[in-house]
Amino acid sequence: GLYRLAEQYEDWCEGTKPFFVHDYHFNYFQVGVESLGEPFFDENGVCFSSAFRRVWEPYARAALKGGVWLQGGYATEPLRTGDSIVSVASSASILYYSTTVTYADNTTEEVEIKALPCPVFEDGKKLVMQRGAGVCTVKSTPEREEACMVFLKWLTDPQKNVEFVTQLGYMPVKQEAFDVYLPKALAGIEDPMYRSLYEAFLKTQEEYEFYTAPQRTDYLKLETDFEQDIRDTLNLCRKKYVETIAEAPELPVWEALERFEMTFSQ
């Protein structure tokens, strides 16, 4: 799988560059746990269930070996500099990807960027996070409110919507757009990077279920704390592992989980 490949990549490059960047660690765990049939959230916050441990193990193993990017920022940054080569990110990130990699010595190399449906667990259902923002109006004059409605109807018209989203990396908003207009639009997309993204969209729409995060008053805090704590924990545990690998060659996967649970639950 993806994380086993990340470990192999680290062996190949002798631990100098992480193979994989995930823009949203919180989403990886959230969707991963839910895809295995268990709830990610409980009344107190995050539920550290058996499914959480299942999702944790391959991720932590790869991260502790150096195969997962644990610094801040978005995936587009290490991909532009060749510091990583694979990412899971928002579809709209395509606006920021570059087919030219610029290395630390200022040399450059052209690369091909290909989009694929989001990876899933072998024993889980095909589930993918749907993150999107709605559009709303504020109280105004009747004329402005009517103008806003006319604009939204125009923007979400299936044909117009496909013309718009295929320039920006967004998903169409109506089923008719997926069924009728997006397949037709593919033939006119000249950029192979964008074409592969929308081919992946069609496959995702056909084969996956979409997961939307629950409405919780503490959601933003849980997400912010989780992202920071998990990176800090794994960075610390990896540093300790590298320093003591001669005496303790076993990856501290479960020690890292215990430390993360303690830190996150404080």
Regions found by a protein language model. Name each.
Residues 1-45, 84:
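Extracytoplasmic/periplasmic solute-binding protein
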Residues 3-8, 73-87, 228, 232-235:
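Short helices/loops that flank or line small-molecule/ion binding pockets
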Residues 3-9, 42-72, 118:
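Glycine-centered hinge/linker elements that transmit conformational signals in sensory
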Residues 10-23, 157-167, 266:
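Bilobed periplasmic-binding protein-like "clamshell/Venus-flytrap" ligand-binding domains
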Residues 61-67, 104-177:
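Extracytoplasmic/periplasmic substrate-recognition and gating elements
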Residues 85-90, 95-97, 107:
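Paired acidic/hydrophobic, glycine-rich loop segments that form the ligand-binding mouth/hinge
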Residues 177-210:
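An extracytoplasmic/periplasmic, membrane-proximal ligand-sensing/linker region
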Residues 199-266:
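Conserved C-terminal helix/tail region of periplasmic/extracytoplasmic solute-binding proteins
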